[in-house]
Amino acid sequence: MLSPSVPSDPPAPLRHPKLLLWAVCALALMSTAGVALPYPILAPIFVNGPVDDFTHFMGLRPELLMGLALAVNPAGILAGSLVVGPMSDRYGRRRVLSITITATLVGYGLSAYALASRDYPLFVLSRFATGLTEGNVAVVRALLADWHPQLDRTRSFAWLNASLYIGWLVGPLLGGLTLPWGEAVPFLVAAVVLVPCLVLLGVGLPDDRPAAAPEGGLLAAMRRQQSLGLVVQDPVLRHLALLQLAYTLGVNALYEFAPLWMLQQADLGSRGIAIVTAVQCAAMTAASLFAARIGSGPVPLHRAARFALVAAVGLLALSLAPSWLGLVLIPALGIPLSFYNALMPAWMSERFAAHGQGRVMGLLTTVFCLSNTMIAIIGGVLGMLSARWIMLLGGATCLLAAIGFIRFARRHS
């Protein structure tokens, strides 16, 4: 039998369930804004920054150093996600969120100090440490799931996704607009943004600590609930995870290195990059809300495969496009990515429910973070040639995944 991922005792009735939903969405928005804030500023910091021990640490190229700085954060999220989920089951969602958000705030402060002191090793270490505590989305989703049916799960998740996309809109905009004030300033802003999150936790979320700790220790809970074991247990999920890895390599090529593309090909600074990124996130927010309104339809897997194909074509076009067309393609690519993100998790949630929702959604997070780390390292090397090569690689892996998804859908939908 599958072990339950949350305590079996139902939560007490909520007096104001909509207030809780709004508090959780606001918490997710502000937390994600802090996570997204550094993305449009790393390319200008490293590639256009001064020639010193930070941007040319150990004589290495700035593109390589930027790739490593990009890679360590999702690597930290990947490692932290194996701990944060079981901890929230054992000690309560609110308590774990309080600890992780406080630790993230401290991590942003360390990143700001490392930039101010031009200490590249400390910057990389702080980005990894911050990643360890940034994987809060799974905990927030679990919190909303705990309160079903007092909060409708489908509608709550739709609002949560929209809040996350708005966070990805607000964060890059803040980062790009504050970078001219100093390289450390965006990270200080990210830390300040998290302070209202801690206030919301205290006043907006009920105390959900279990009356008694679940049987077994934390390590036993982690072994029981970790997601990677699913690829060993289920050959269908293993096949799907490999396709998802190829697809998210392309997606993360866009997420991580579109700022470098805009810097190299369109000569945009931090503010221009932030504006384009904000437009992309706005498109993703609108597409996510539209996808929630129209639902998944009768053949969600086939539709997800088609959107993956559209994304692949867009990435391949971006690798060849002139600067003006690329600045149109980058925001437009957010639309098929959002529809895919709405369809594929919904289909997996229904198809593999027997494995436990937390583990299945955790597998998607694990694959995404793994591909994020991989493309950050590979892209750091290819970026020394041109960001176009990164988009070409991302488009190729996305195209292979899309073809595989189409065949997979014919067999398993």
Regions found by a protein language model. Give the residues of each.
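Short amphipathic helix-loop junctions that connect adjacent transmembrane helices
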Residues: 40-63, 256-272
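Cytoplasmic helix-loop-helix junction between adjacent transmembrane helices
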Residues: 126-164
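Hydrophobic core of transmembrane alpha-helices in multi-pass small-molecule transporters
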Residues: 107, 120-135, 325-339
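Helix-to-loop junctions at the C-terminal end of transmembrane segments
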Residues: 79-92, 287-300, 383
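Central cavity-lining transmembrane alpha-helices of secondary-active solute carriers
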Residues: 67-85, 278-290
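Cytoplasmic membrane-interface "Motif A"-like loop-to-helix N-cap segments
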Residues: 90-101, 296-308
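C-terminal ends and interior cores of transmembrane alpha-helices
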Residues: 102-117, 310-321
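Juxtamembrane intracellular "pre-TM" segments in multi-pass secondary transporters
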Residues: 6-17, 206-241
